[in-house]
Amino acid sequence: TVGVIAMILASVKPKEKLILQRNSHRSAIAGLVLGQIEPIFIQSNFNSELGIFTGITPDDLLKCIMKNPDAKAVLLTSPNYYGMATDLDGLIKVARDHKLTVLVDEAHGVHFHFNPYLPKSAVDLRADMVVQSIHKTLPSFTQTSILHLNEDKIEKERIQTLLAYLQTSSPSYLFMMSIDAVRSYMAIKGKEIIDREIEIANFARAEIKKFKYIKSFNKNDIIGKDGVFDFDPTKLTITTKYAGYSGFEVESILNSKFNIEIELSDMNNILCFITAGSSTEDIKKLTSALTYFDENKKIMDNEFEIELPNIPPLKMLPTLTFSKTPELIPFSESAGAISYDVICPYPPGIPLL
């Protein structure tokens, strides 16, 4: 969160424009508020079958830049929570051609650098600044993250000053040791660890393929569609809607009936992470529990098609909104009003409103 805010404040001055995906993390909204910055949102592509926002394409970005030639920077999010990665190389080239500073929220991709079977890391693709949440996919303490700088373009001193303003002046040495320990761990054993994770994930997909109604997509099912350029196979998305269950229902039943805790649920899916701590025994326990849903198919009570609204026009800078005195009104009466704050389900931490 602090890394995203610092990237934004280091790249864009008050009242200047930042191009960003509409499915950016809520920390990006905080950066807009603190920096008095005008957002130019790009609607991400959407996989309607899964009900998942994916990402943007180089062509999407180019069209936006053509309409906003005075934008100063672009904030890209790749991969998304589900491991779907955009064409970062192409996006970076488009941004560079138009002299935009390239910021990447790679919160879920810190492990990409360590294995050739994963998408390319934004760090290796030389984005100007990249923030990664180490704790999301690697064995480090919660809150541990890292901000990478391309020092050919970014003043390190300015970032250091911003970080001093934004975060604690008494950092935890336990957290810092955790970062260094996992860095060493991955430098020595990273490829081997991720090879094993991918093997376990593939085993899980093979087991799920035996079901009639419970499904799990693989690389070939999604690459080249809806803006997806590459995929992290260690993210195991299990689609439950064909069995008549929402992901929310499945998460609740897995927890209460089978003592299984998953990462995330949505209307159509549940999401599991395969990490260094995962085992084939974990997968066997999970797939055994999923048998319950496959064998007890039902008609989903609230099945519906999502109709995506257009991004509404910006009536007021987020900074000005935040400076107003809010009024609490019923949701049913809120059409046409300006939202004072974000409404943000977590995970994944993407503002709904």
Question: Residue spans of the language-model regions?
Answer:
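Conserved C-terminal alpha-helix-loop-beta "cap" of PLP-dependent enzymes
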Residues: 203-353
